[in-house]
Amino acid sequence: MLRVLPTSFKSISTRSAFRACQLSPLTVYCPLKSSQGTDIKSLEDLTKLKSLEGVDPELIRKLINERTIELNVQNELEMLKNLNKQEKMSQEVSLKRFVRPLWVFFLMSSTVYLILHYVWWKLEVVEKEKELQSHVESLEMELDQTLKSQNQNVSSSQNNGNNKTNDKPWYRKWFF
């Protein structure tokens, strides 16, 4: 009867333990009868005996070796399970190490974005104000030119009109 070990279990000591289990599994032993007439299949059977006087020392050695191999295999399996758990925990810890820096990065980048956006907006407003100010100045110049041209026309017409009205007496200006 063969015992099957997990495929991930690949250490050298487990291979030798596996070979030992193949060569001498507990179920393959023929129950030997001691001088007291009982069948001895395991170390537990040996503990039930009152004395070890009639028991074959070779059988005791084989049972002890077999039990030692089984315990070693169990210890190695537990060790591998613990190593797997530690590896998973170390992976989780490594992910936790990056969470805080990522939050800091996102907060810093959003702050930089908002500051740059505000600066861009402020520059746009200043540029628009300059553009509107230049437009207002051009309109004021045009208005001034128009007013000057109208004033010149009015003053020239008044000069022409003043010559005619100056010929009339002052009391006629009131009635006509």
UniProtKB/Swiss-Prot annotation:
Main location group: mitochondrion
Localization (cell): Mitochondrion inner membrane
Bias (Low complexity) ranges: 149-163
GO CC terms in record: mitochondrial inner membrane
Assigned keywords, A-Z: Chaperone, Coiled coil, Membrane, Mitochondrion, Mitochondrion inner membrane, Transit peptide, Transmembrane, Transmembrane helix
Topological category with respect to the lipid bilayer: Single-pass membrane protein
Membrane-spanning parts: 99-121
Transit peptide: 1-28
Coiled coil residues, start to end: 123-151
Disordered: region residues: 149-168
Keyword Nucleotide-binding: no
Family in the record: Belongs to the INA17 family.
Role played: Component of the INA complex (INAC) that promotes the biogenesis of mitochondrial F(1)F(0)-ATP synthase. INAC facilitates the assembly of the peripheral stalk and promotes the assembly of the catalytic F(1)-domain with the membrane-embedded F(0)-domain.
Binding partners and assembly: Component of the inner membrane assembly (INA) complex, composed of INA17 and INA22. Interacts with a subset of F(1)F(0)-ATP synthase subunits of the F(1)-domain and the peripheral stalk.
Name the record gives this protein: Inner membrane assembly complex subunit 17
